C-alpha cells in the first residue's frame, strides 16, 4: 500500500523543476494531523475539553481544543523554511514569519485549525482545513496582507483532515483529489481513496433546518424541493446534517449530496469564512467534479475584501448545486 510520503515524492517527480517546498509543507501538515489525532483521541481523559474562556476575533467562544490546534499548527509551520506567513480563523491578523528564512519563503497558509470543535465534547467528528498560496509580495521582505487576500482560484493546494471513526487527510494540488487514512499501528497515512470523484447527482442535503424561518426564499424553496416526492428525480432526498463542515462535506464527497450554509436574517453575509473554509472546500469540490457557489457566484472567483470575510456556501454534487442556484436566482432582488 502506498504511503502519503511515497505519494508526495511521486507527484513531485512529475515536475522536474520542483524544489520540494510544497512537499515539505504537506509533510508538516501530515505531522500536525498525527498530533491532533493523538490529542483528540484522549480528549476526554485530559483537560482539553470545553471552553477556554476566551473569544476569537469573530466574538465566538474558543474551545480549548481550538487553541491547542491553532498553536500546534502555528508552531509546526514556523519550523518550516518554506512558509512565509500564516493566517488562522482564531487570530485577528495574519502572522508574518519575520526571520531570514521566513522572508525568503514562497508560500503562505490559511487555516481553520479545528472546524466543528463545539462537537468534540459529544464525540462528533471534527476537522482541520488548510489552504496554500504562493505569496505575491517580494521575496526577501515580510509578507503583507495582500498575500492573504487572494481569490481561491490562486490556491496551489488545499485540503482537510477529518478526525472521526478513522482519521483521514484529503488534499488537492490542482490535479485531482486523493485521500489517505491514518494507520495508528504503524503511524502512517496510507492512500485509501485515489482520485476521489463526487457523484454528479446526489440524494443527501445538509443544512441546519432549525434556522428555516431565517433563510432566503430561494433556500426555503430548495428545501421543499428536496422533501417532495418524485420518482423521476429520486426524491425525497435524505437530510443529513452533522454541524461540522468537514464531516458533512466529506460524506457528500463520497456519497453525493449538497451542503448549504446560506445567508440568514441573523447572518446576512453567511457565517462561514471565505478564506479559511469557503475557498479550500470549493477547490476540493471542483477538483472532484463538484460545484461551489455563494448562491450566485463561483466561490473561487470571489475577490476577498477582509481577512475574516464571511460567505454563504452551496457546495456539492453539480446537479444539486445548480438546482439550488436556479432557485436562488429566481428570488434574487
From Swiss-Prot:
One of the protein's GO biological processes: fructose 1,6-bisphosphate metabolic process
Enzyme Commission number: 3.1.3.11
Binding site for Mg(2+) 1: 89, 112, 114
Compartment(s) of residence: Cytoplasm
Binding-site residues for substrate, renumbered to this chain: 115-118, 208, 241, 271
Pathway field: Carbohydrate biosynthesis; gluconeogenesis
Record has Cell cycle as a keyword: no
Family the UniProt entry places it in: Belongs to the FBPase class 1 family.
Protein's name according to its UniProt entry: Fructose-1,6-bisphosphatase class 1
Amino acid at each position: 500500500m502506498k504511503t502519503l510520503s511515497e505519494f508526495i515524492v511521486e507527484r513531485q517527480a512529475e515536475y522536474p523543476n520542483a524544489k520540494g517546498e510544497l512537499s515539505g509543507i504537506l509533510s508538516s501538515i501530515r505531522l500536525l494531523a498525527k498530533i491532533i489525532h493523538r490529542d483528540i483521541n484522549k480528549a476526554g481523559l485530559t483537560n482539553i475539553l470545553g471552553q477556554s474562556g476566551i473569544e476569537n476575533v469573530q466574538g465566538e467562544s474558543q474551545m480549548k481544543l481550538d487553541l491547542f490546534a491553532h498553536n500546534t499548527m502555528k508552531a509546526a509551520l514556523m519550523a518550516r523554511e518554506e512558509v512565509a506567513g500564516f493566517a488562522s480563523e482564531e487570530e485577528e491578523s495574519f502572522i508574518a514569519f519575520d526571520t531570514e528564512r521566513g522572508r525568503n519563503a514562497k508560500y503562505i497558509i490559511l487555516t481553520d485549525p479545528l472546524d466543528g470543535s463545539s462537537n468534540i465534547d459529544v464525540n462528533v467528528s471534527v476537522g482541520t482545513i488548510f489552504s496554500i498560496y504562493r505569496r505575491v509580495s517580494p521575496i526577501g521582505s515580510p509578507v503583507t496582507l495582500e498575500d492573504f487576500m487572494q481569490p481561491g482560484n490562486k490556491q496551489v493546494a488545499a485540503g482537510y483532515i477529518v478526525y472521526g471513526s478513522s482519521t483521514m487527510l484529503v488534499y488537492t494540488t490542482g490535479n485531482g483529489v486523493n485521500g489517505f487514512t491514518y494507520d495508528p499501528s504503524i503511524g502512517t497515512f496510507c492512500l485509501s481513496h485515489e482520485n476521489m470523484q463526487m457523484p454528479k447527482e446526489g440524494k443527501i442535503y445538509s443544512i441546519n433546518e432549525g434556522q428555516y424561518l431565517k433563510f432566503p426564499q430561494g433556500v426555503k424553496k430548495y428545501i421543499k424541493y428536496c422533501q417532495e416526492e418524485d420518482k423521476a428525480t429520486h426524491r425525497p432526498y435524505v437530510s443529513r446534517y452533522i454541524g461540522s463542515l468537514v464531516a458533512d462535506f466529506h460524506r457528500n464527497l463520497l456519497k453525493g449530496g449538497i451542503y448549504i450554509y446560506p445567508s440568514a436574517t441573523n447572518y446576512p453575509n453567511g457565517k462561514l469564512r471565505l478564506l479559511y473554509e469557503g475557498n479550500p472546500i470549493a477547490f476540493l469540490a471542483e477538483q472532484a467534479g463538484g460545484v461551489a457557489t455563494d448562491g450566485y457566484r463561483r466561490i473561487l472567483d470571489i475577490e476577498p475584501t477582509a481577512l475574516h470575510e464571511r460567505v454563504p456556501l452551496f457546495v456539492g454534487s453539480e446537479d444539486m448545486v445548480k438546482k439550488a442556484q436556479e432557485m436562488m436566482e429566481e428570488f434574487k432582488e
